[in-house]
Amino acid sequence: MSNVLDELIERGYAKQFTHEEETRKLLSEEKVTFYIGFDPTGDSLHVGHFIALMLMARMQKAGHRPIVLIGGGTAMVGDPTGKTDMRKMLTREEINHNVECLKKQMSRFIDFSDDKAIIVNNAEWLMGQNYIEFLREVGVHFSVNKMLTAECFKQRMEKGLSFLEFNYMLMQGFDFYKLNEKYDCKMELGGDDQWSNMIAGVELIRRKSNKKAYAMTSALLTNSEGKKMGKTEKGALWLDAEKTSPYDFFQYWRNVNDADVEKCLSMLTFLPMDEVRRLASLKDQEINKAKEVLAYEVTKLVHGEEEAKKALNSSKALFGGGTNMDNVPTVSIPEDMLSSSILDVLVHTKIIPSKGEGRRLVQQGGITLNDTKVEDFNYEITKEDFNDDGFALVRRGKKKYYKIVIG
């Protein structure tokens, strides 16, 4: 069995370990069952989750067994990590709906056949848990003084941390304990912001079961400026094609900064590292070839080869002056908006957030209509602006294209 840890370190996944050398030895000597938790606070995964999915896929390819822990129980409380305000509490019905949606999405990335991976919902043991028993069984092993120093609580302490959220660390630690007890799960993986919660599980297993457990955090997907990637003007970059079209998904990666190409190729694709370094070393206009490869590979993983090819062809057609518009996002206006100003139309279709932003873009030459730069704020859209295929083509900035249709 290959040791995957060196690969994870080389590709930039591994960040912190409870026991690095022991973890390396463990992964080289046995098939390890490990887990990553996902809270079902939405009905789709987004790019922030994709790092975790890639991490699981790489571990699975190396012969280890993933447990996908869906936090149906912990979602009733809400994770305070990285938040300055208390999260909206979801109903059981909302959580159950989201759990089903996430299960379907994850099956595209992880092989669940023949017990090669397991999906478990922590509602199984948390929802029926007797509170007094939980305090006696779990709470006795946690020091409040130590918990208050945890990074995950610091941002919330000034505004006020509810007792509900304060329990989250105990619940996550209990998750690891239950998975260790039932499935011999020896390792938890997660984002670097979960470090305190992960240590809690390692310590709980040691105290209650007198067994060794391990934790490793992965780097969060950030750009060269340290900001989280995966945010667009429309919000999060979703893995669900209904929420973020394959074309928009492709274009996001096609347009990343030059400085982020190597990191993204390394963490978000299965390309060999020699090829990653070769592509990342390209300069000037040549780096766009690397971005095209990045966009294609990531879109293929998330949406399949057919959708990736469609997005690639549409992107090439647009940037090369071609006419293939099949995968360009389409927005519509009612017929009674004909003769409205270009700014009214762009705001209505959400191509721009406001007229003020639209005026700024027009002044800077950042809006084109059918390849003609818009220079008049009050230009009126008419039927003459729509081609034989029934759409008008708007470009915002250098690379954002939209088809406007009537209907």
Swiss-Prot record:
UniProt xrefs under InterPro entries: aa-tRNA-synth_I_CS, aa-tRNA-synth_Ic, Rossmann-like_a/b/a_fold, S4_RNA-bd_sf, SYY-like_C, Tyr-tRNA-ligase, Tyr-tRNA-ligase_bac-type, Tyr-tRNA-ligase_bac_1
Keywords: Aminoacyl-tRNA synthetase, ATP-binding, Cytoplasm, Ligase, Nucleotide-binding, Protein biosynthesis, RNA-binding
CDD domains the UniProt entry points to: TyrRS_core (cd00805)
Taxonomic superkingdom: Bacteria
EC category name: ligase
Stored SUPFAM superfamilies: Alpha-L RNA-binding motif (SSF55174), Nucleotidylyl transferase (SSF52374)
Localization per record: Cytoplasm
Pfam families associated with the record: SYY_C-terminal (PF22421), tRNA-synt_1b (PF00579)
Any single GO CC term annotated in Swiss-Prot or TrEMBL for this entry: cytosol
UniProt-annotated binding residues for ATP: K231
Domain S4 RNA-binding: 340-406
Chief place where the protein resides: cytoplasm
GO molecular function: ATP binding; RNA binding; tyrosine-tRNA ligase activity
NCBIfam families on file: tyrS
Protein name, as recorded: Tyrosine--tRNA ligase 1
Species whose genome carries this gene: Clostridium acetobutylicum (strain ATCC 824 / DSM 792 / JCM 1419 / IAM 19013 / LMG 5710 / NBRC 13948 / NRRL B-527 / VKM B-1787 / 2291 / W)
Gene coding for it: tyrS1
